[in-house]
Amino acid sequence: MNQRNNLIDFSDREKFFLYDVSGLGIDLDNKFDDFGVTNILRKQTAKAASLKAKLLVGQNSPIAYEVFVEMFEFLNSPPFKMIYETDAGLYYRDCVLSKLTKGDMEKGRVFIEDIAFDFTGFYYQWKNQSYSPVENIDGNGKIYGWSVYPYNYESDINGVGGVFQIDNNSLLFGLEGSSPVEVTIKGPCENPSWEITNGSKILQSDAYNLAIDDGYKLVVSSFPGEQACKLIAPDGTSSNVYQQQDTSKTNFVSIPIGQSFFVFHNFGKNVEFKFKEYRGVT
């Protein structure tokens, strides 16, 4: 899938077909400190990985040249997401083109070329959660009649919202890391804030000193290369709100591996967020 959300199926056997595929795993770079006959792992990082394959273009098509042009147009809108589906589920992996050969048409009016993509991260699945407060209606409480003065106890419905337990089950092969997250707050509300906690400890936090009118929404993203905080109007126009970000917070939070809590304050009609749960190999 390219930046315009156009898709090419490299397994359809009609226009495009990949074979002799390699590079779907990971490659780790290990740094050791030597102590006599013992080596102690000091640092571990993931090397850049590349998908390499043979590409057959126009196998069952009478217009192989036009099919090749179709692929050129697709590749003209980077970056790309590889969509990889197995028995374990559907995963994405971000990538950029690194090689595409172009030779003469082979017998049978097909092209057989080399193609390669450099991956910019691990496989991932999207994880989404949201909460919309329920309107607190007068009279939806309970009457307890055993006291001297019967009292109508209203349930604080809104008070239970905005707290999410998160289980980030990313598999990073021992590498340190966390999952970037995109938060969306829909107005009306004032001075929204949120934090990630573990027990009583606040791990990360973010806050914005601004009013969000009805119909507007605040979108804050910590995705690498897409880090932003913007206010989006009902007509789709957006404006940066960096100046309204509370710099006393850690800002641009990410979801740690394992269990944690995502706690929101002063949100409006709806709060939602999505993050990437990573897999080194799938």
Regions found by a protein language model. Give the residues of each.
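Oligomerization/assembly interface segments of phage tail-like spikes and tubes
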Residues: 38-63, 109-122, 260
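Short, acidic/charged, Gly/Pro-enriched secondary-structure junctions
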Residues: 7, 58-100, 261
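Short beta-strand and beta-hairpin "edge-sheet" elements
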Residues: 18-19, 25-26, 81-128
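Beta-strand elements of well-folded, non-transmembrane domains
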Residues: 55-59, 101, 119-123, 187-189, ...
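Intrinsically disordered, low-complexity segments enriched in serine, threonine, and glycine
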Residues: 134-282
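Polar/acidic, low-complexity leader/linker segments enriched in S/T/G and N/D
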Residues: 1-34
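"Short basic amphipathic alpha-helical interaction patches in structured regions
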Residues: 66-73, 110-113, 129-134
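Short amphipathic beta-strand/extended segments with alternating polar/hydrophobic composition
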Residues: 19-21, 29-30, 91-98, 203-210, ...
